[in-house]
Amino acid sequence: MNILHNFVVFEGIDGTGTSTQLRALERHFQARKDMVFTQEPTGGEIGTLIRDVLQKRVIMSSKALGLLFAADRHEHLEGAGGINDCLAEGKIVLCDRYVFSSLVYQGMAVSGSFAYELNKEFPLPEVVFYFDAPIEVCVERITARGLQTELYEYTSFQEKARKGYETIFRKCRHLYPAMKVIEIDAREEIEVVHERILHHLREYRRLK
């Protein structure tokens, strides 16, 4: 499996703070021109359609949504100015969510084999920060943002997703030792988590 040097990914269930921490790093490194901060779904046309589906403005099947995620990821990697171009220029790319989210969520919505077949050819990042926190902590944070779904159903769904992430990263540690998986205790305060991530980035990338 191909490993992309200088490609760093943040993963975790909703409410663990991946987006919050990516924005904090973007502010911290705003003066640097050799760092790129991005996310999936992207802000492109395919990514925008995905967001419309996730927000129930557009209705489609789970399989169709999985295909859209794969198409968005392919364009994110291979498109002009995408991840591969940035890495080729010697930049460090940090991304909020990547292939692991699809393996978890499309694996739950359709099947693990479907998600794997769609995503097996994508290269892996050099480093993954896996944000983990108890479900009740995540639900409390999501509720504070205005949760618009039935609480029990949402909690059950996220419990399954958390187990899915744990299974995937346990397998990754065994199958792909060249990809570093760093588990982050996302229960801690935002500033504490931010400093932990900075420590690891400095350790691996010698960042200032």
Swiss-Prot record:
<feature type="region of interest" description="Defective ATP-binding">
    <location>
        <begin position="12"/>
        <end position="19"/>
    </location>
</feature>
<keyword id="KW-0545">Nucleotide biosynthesis</keyword>
<dbReference type="Pfam" id="PF02223">
    <property type="entry name" value="Thymidylate_kin"/>
</dbReference>
<dbReference type="GO" id="GO:0005524">
    <property type="term" value="F:ATP binding"/>
</dbReference>
<dbReference type="GO" id="GO:0006235">
    <property type="term" value="P:dTTP biosynthetic process"/>
</dbReference>
<dbReference type="InterPro" id="IPR039430">
    <property type="entry name" value="Thymidylate_kin-like_dom"/>
</dbReference>
<dbReference type="GO" id="GO:0006233">
    <property type="term" value="P:dTDP biosynthetic process"/>
</dbReference>
<keyword id="KW-0547">Nucleotide-binding</keyword>
<dbReference type="GO" id="GO:0004798">
    <property type="term" value="F:dTMP kinase activity"/>
</dbReference>
<dbReference type="InterPro" id="IPR027417">
    <property type="entry name" value="P-loop_NTPase"/>
</dbReference>
<dbReference type="InterPro" id="IPR018094">
    <property type="entry name" value="Thymidylate_kinase"/>
</dbReference>
<dbReference type="GO" id="GO:0006227">
    <property type="term" value="P:dUDP biosynthetic process"/>
</dbReference>
<keyword id="KW-0067">ATP-binding</keyword>
<dbReference type="GO" id="GO:0005737">
    <property type="term" value="C:cytoplasm"/>
</dbReference>
<comment type="similarity">
    <text>Belongs to the thymidylate kinase family.</text>
</comment>
<keyword id="KW-0418">Kinase</keyword>
<protein>
    <recommendedName>
        <fullName>Putative thymidylate kinase</fullName>
        <ecNumber>2.7.4.9</ecNumber>
    </recommendedName>
</protein>
<dbReference type="InterPro" id="IPR018095">
    <property type="entry name" value="Thymidylate_kin_CS"/>
</dbReference>
<keyword id="KW-0808">Transferase</keyword>
